Every structure is written in structure tokens, then in C-alpha cells.
């Protein structure tokens, strides 16, 4: 077997680094998305195949700057021979290697536009099935979602407007926000970051300059604050995966902070929080209500993605308060401690559904493609 070059080994290492290892570890979840800012993948290579039967040949499309869906736990290297193509690093005229399926793993429309545009050109030249068509992913940026998903019955989206830091730092910053329909408190975010990084609340007009100056990038997102806080002072963030047209509840995080993330919440310390999450995972429709479930199904249909997820809260009237809906959602394994045992079934169902979808899409054409 030919010895792999150093650049090839580097590419494969980065491919595995996209997978976080613990749902309650901040560093693990952040590592999956830090790569979009801090490292570059420069080569396209084939991953090792470890199976004994003839493999299913799969092309995986990724971005050089990150924003990719973690897939190592979904693609069994004893089943798939995976060729990873970094779309924004190859020629637009490049030929795809022999394949039976294309998995577009580029998930973040806000930071991966060049890679997605290149991916659109690549998939136009294949007749094989494509999971997560890049043209559909391209429509899932935060600004675009805030506009199109507000038309879904029972869904409340946050007004989201891109603004330059220069405008926000100027004396006219508060007035500009007011003209766009914002009021305080409101949120500012640097595009392309996840896990709560560079995402802050601006409580008053007097805080605007300091907060805007603290964020990286010259283009920021001004976002309406959707208050999901209940009378007891807690806020909830539900995550539901949308896989092959079906909904899979994944987790519920409860926190006294407005910015709710699983790894910063008190889920590990609060047995009553975990009991509420267990009820959500066991019977999503009863916890959310049929109105919210219908709204989630409509969101899934509107997104048009094979693999995606949605983070949201609930209003007092049962409306979905949409925080995020796209393909970048991570399915993380729960810890092995006994108090996380109730989470394993839901996680297994979501991962199993994704794996079954991938094999189904490829298997339908396996014999024909060989």
C-alpha cells in the first residue's frame, strides 16, 4: 500500500477533529466549530476503507474553513469508501471520483458561501443521489431563515439584520437600529460562530458601542431578543433533529441565563431539569403540544434538507420561538455517568436514522453504479 503523504495525513486528522466527544464539555463542542476560524484543510483525499466486502463509494463535500457537519460517527469506514473533497480548494472543472452517493457536509451558510457555491457546481455534474443539496443549505443563513420561516404558522422568528461595525460604533448606531425595528435589549452576533461564541446581549443604547467593539469582524448581525424566560426565571432551549423528513428530539437545556447551551446549563446538577428533559425525549408531542410539532414539521419541509436540526423555545401560547435551523447541528453522545442514561435512547435513534438514510440513499443504486 502506498504511503500517505504528510498533507494527506493532515487532511484525515482534521476530518476526525470535526467530531465532538462529550455533550457537556465546552471545549469539545467548541472544537468542532473553532476549526472554521483557526485552521485550513488544503488537500482532497480518500479516507481509508477497513471493510471486507466491496465498499459503497461516497463523496463527501467539505469547506476548507470549517462550518462542516461532523460525520465520522455517521459514516462507517467498514461500509463506505469516502473521498473527501474540499470544494473551495479544487478546480471548478474537477471530476468527481467514482461514487454512488454525494454527502454535502458543508452546513454553515453564513461562513461557507464560497464552498457552497463551488459545491453547487460539482453536484450539477452527478446523476447520483445528493444528501443535503448545497443549494438548499445556501438558503439557511440566519438572515434568510428569519425572513422565510416567519411565514410558517406558529413560528416566531427574530428580526435579523446585517450591519457594519462602523455603523454600530457611530453616534447614529442606536437610531439606525431603531429605524430597522430594534429595541433594547437586543443581540449582536459575529456570523459563522457557534456554541455561544461572539454572541452577546446589548441591554441599553449606552452599551452598544462597547459591545459592538468587543466582537470580531467588520460585519455583525443585529438580532431581536426573543425572550423565552418563564415566570420562575428559567429559559429552555429544545433541539430537534430533522432527518429524512422525520423529527427526532435530541435534548432540552434549561438555564437561568438567556443564552442557553447544554454545556453551560445546570442539567448535570439539577435532577428536576433532567426529569423534564427525559419527558421531552420520551414524548415530544405531549411536552411541546401538537401545534408546535406541526410547526416543526413545516420548518423541516421548508428547509428541504435531508439532515438538519432546529433549536427553539416555546412561547406561552405554544408558538415556536426559533433560535436556529440549519445543518450544523451536532449529535453528541451523552456521558457514561448513570444520571445521563435516559438520553442514550434518543441519541441512538437520531444517529441510527441518519445512518439508515445514508445507506438507503446509496444502496438504492449500489448494484447499478458498480
List each model region and its residues:
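Glycine-rich phosphate-binding loop of ATP-grasp-fold ATP-dependent ligases
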Residues: 157-160, 184-210
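C-terminal active-site "lid" helix and adjoining low-complexity regulatory extension at the edge
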Residues: 301-305, 314-370
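Short coil turns that delineate tetratricopeptide repeat
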Residues: 9, 42-43
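Phosphate-binding site of ATP-dependent enzymes
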Residues: 199-295, 299
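Canonical positions in the second alpha-helix
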Residues: 3-5, 37-38
Amino acid at each position: 500500500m502506498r504511503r500517505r503523504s504528510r498533507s494527506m495525513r493532515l487532511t484525515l486528522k482534521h476530518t476526525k477533529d470535526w467530531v465532538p466527544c462529550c455533550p457537556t464539555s465546552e471545549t469539545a463542542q467548541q472544537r468542532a466549530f473553532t476549526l472554521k476560524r483557526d485552521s485550513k484543510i488544503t488537500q482532497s483525499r480518500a479516507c481509508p476503507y477497513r471493510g471486507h466486502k466491496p465498499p459503497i463509494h461516497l463523496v463527501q463535500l467539505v469547506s476548507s474553513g470549517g462550518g462542516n457537519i461532523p460525520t465520522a460517527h455517521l459514516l462507517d469506514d467498514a461500509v463506505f469508501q469516502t473521498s473527501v473533497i474540499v470544494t473551495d480548494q479544487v478546480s471548478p472543472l474537477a471530476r468527481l471520483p467514482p461514487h454512488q452517493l454525494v454527502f454535502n457536509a458543508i452546513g454553515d451558510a453564513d461562513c461557507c458561501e464560497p464552498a457552497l457555491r463551488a459545491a453547487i457546481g460539482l453536484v450539477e455534474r452527478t446523476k447520483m443521489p445528493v444528501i443535503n443539496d448545497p443549494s438548499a443549505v445556501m438558503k439557511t443563513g440566519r438572515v434568510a431563515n428569519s425572513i422565510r420561516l416567519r411565514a410558517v404558522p406558529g413560528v416566531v422568528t427574530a428580526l435579523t439584520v446585517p450591519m457594519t461595525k462602523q455603523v454600530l460604533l457611530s453616534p447614529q448606531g442606536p437610531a439606525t437600529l431603531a429605524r430597522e425595528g430594534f429595541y433594547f435589549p437586543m443581540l449582536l452576533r459575529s456570523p459563522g460562530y457557534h456554541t455561544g461564541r461572539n454572541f452577546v446581549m446589548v441591554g441599553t443604547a449606552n452599551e452598544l458601542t462597547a459591545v459592538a467593539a468587543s466582537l470580531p469582524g467588520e460585519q455583525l448581525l443585529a438580532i431581536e431578543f426573543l425572550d423565552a424566560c418563564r415566570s420562575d426565571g428559567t429559559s429552555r432551549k429544545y433541539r430537534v433533529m430533522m432527518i429524512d423528513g422525520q423529527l427526532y428530539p435530541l435534548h432540552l437545556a434549561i438555564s437561568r441565563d438567556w443564552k442557553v447551551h447544554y454545556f453551560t446549563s445546570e442539567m448535570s446538577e439539577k435532577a428536576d431539569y433532567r426529569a423534564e428533559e427525559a419527558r421531552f425525549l420520551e414524548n415530544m408531542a405531549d411536552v411541546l403540544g401538537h401545534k408546535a410539532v406541526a410547526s416543526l414539521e413545516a420548518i423541516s419541509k421548508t428547509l428541504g434538507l435531508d439532515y438538519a436540526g432546529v433549536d427553539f423555545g416555546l412561547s406561552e401560547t405554544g408558538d415556536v420561538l426559533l433560535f436556529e435551523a440549519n445543518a450544523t447541528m451536532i449529535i453528541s453522545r451523552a456521558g457514561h455517568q448513570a444520571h445521563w442514561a435516559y438520553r442514550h435512547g434518543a441519541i441512538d435513534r437520531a444517529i441510527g436514522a441518519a445512518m439508515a438514510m445514508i445507506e438507503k440513499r446509496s444502496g438504492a443504486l449500489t448494484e447499478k453504479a458498480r
